[in-house]
């Protein structure tokens, strides 16, 4: 008896786990991979007997006197000014109408068919109509503002910079993550080392969180399971 109960419990547990897997909705992050990059260490300088050494290790932060501070190497930082304001609106309507009418009868009927078709017994009249009206509309709005400092993780062959960055903010028992990646044209970088997000190509902005507040906003796995199975 106990053995059968154990088998029943095991089967029930497997069934519940299977239902959980069917109802689970995978979440793929927009910004994948590492969210930071370290500068590549340069070769050790070779002493040439001069007081000024033109070849300095990259870790020393050497920079020519007349060169600006704009990022151009892997590991350089850049501030992204988030200025996303996107809105979309769509509406559509359709009207269709159709009417039809048909009459059929015998004006003259032979005498031997009078009993069957006479006195308008064979007259047929049919009419029909069909009307369709449809309307639809959709509105969407998205606003995102703020600043985020990112790191150059790749220098493309045409001189553009691929940047990636992340900011984590812990609030009570939850953590907010802001991730960003995209391709920046160095010509769009201002003198203050900033660039608006509207001028970043292939921009990917992700704002997610974890904790009990984020979990409260998600539908339970059992509800999602019945929602997927419900025909309504």
Swiss-Prot record:
Keyword terms, alphabetized: Bacterial flagellum, Cell outer membrane, Lipoprotein, Membrane, Palmitate, Signal
Lipid addition sites, N-palmitoyl cysteine: 22
InterPro entries: Flag_Lring
Topology relative to the membrane: Lipid-anchor
Domain of life: Bacteria
BP terms from Gene Ontology: bacterial-type flagellum-dependent cell motility
Signal sequence interval, chain numbering: 1-21
Record GO terms (molecular function): cytoskeletal motor activity
GO cellular component: bacterial-type flagellum basal body, distal rod, L ring; cell outer membrane
Keyword Kinase: no
Cellular compartments annotated: Cell outer membrane; Bacterial flagellum basal body
Main location: membrane
Positions of S-diacylglycerol cysteine lipidation: 22
PANTHER family: FLAGELLAR L-RING PROTEIN
Family (UniProt): Belongs to the FlgH family.
HAMAP family for the chain: FlgH
Subunit field text: The basal body constitutes a major portion of the flagellar organelle and consists of four rings (L,P,S, and M) mounted on a central rod.
Purpose: Assembles around the rod to form the L-ring and probably protects the motor/basal body from shearing forces during rotation.
Protein name as annotated: Flagellar L-ring protein
Gene assigned in the entry: flgH
């Amino acid at each position: 008896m106990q053995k059968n109960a154990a088998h029943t419990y095991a089967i029930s547990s497997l069934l519940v786990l299977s239902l959980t897997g069917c109802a689970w909705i995978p979440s793929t992050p927009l910004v994948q991979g590492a969210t930071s990059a370290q500068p590549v260490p340069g070769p050790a300088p070779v002493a040439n007997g001069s007081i000024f050494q033109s070849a300095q290790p990259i870790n020393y932060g050497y920079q020519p006197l007349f060169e600006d501070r704009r990022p151009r190497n892997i590991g350089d930082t850049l501030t992204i000014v988030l200025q996303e304001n996107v809105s979309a609106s769509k509406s559509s309507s359709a009207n269709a109408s159709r009417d039809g009418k048909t009459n059929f009868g015998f004006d003259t009927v032979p005498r031997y068919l009078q009993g069957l078709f006479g006195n308008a017994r064979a007259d047929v009249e049919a009419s029909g109509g069909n009307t369709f009206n449809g309307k639809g509309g959709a509105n969407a709005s998205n606003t995102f503002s703020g600043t985020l400092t990112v790191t150059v993780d790749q220098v493309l062959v045409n001189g553009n910079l691929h940047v990636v960055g992340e900011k984590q903010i812990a609030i009570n028992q939850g953590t907010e993550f802001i991730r960003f990646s995209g391709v920046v044209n160095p010509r769009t970088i201002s003198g203050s080392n900033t660039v608006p997000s509207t001028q970043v190509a292939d921009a990917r902005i992700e704002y997610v969180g974890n904790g009990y507040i984020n979990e409260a906003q998600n539908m339970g796995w059992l509800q999602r399971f019945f929602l997927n199975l419900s025909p309504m």
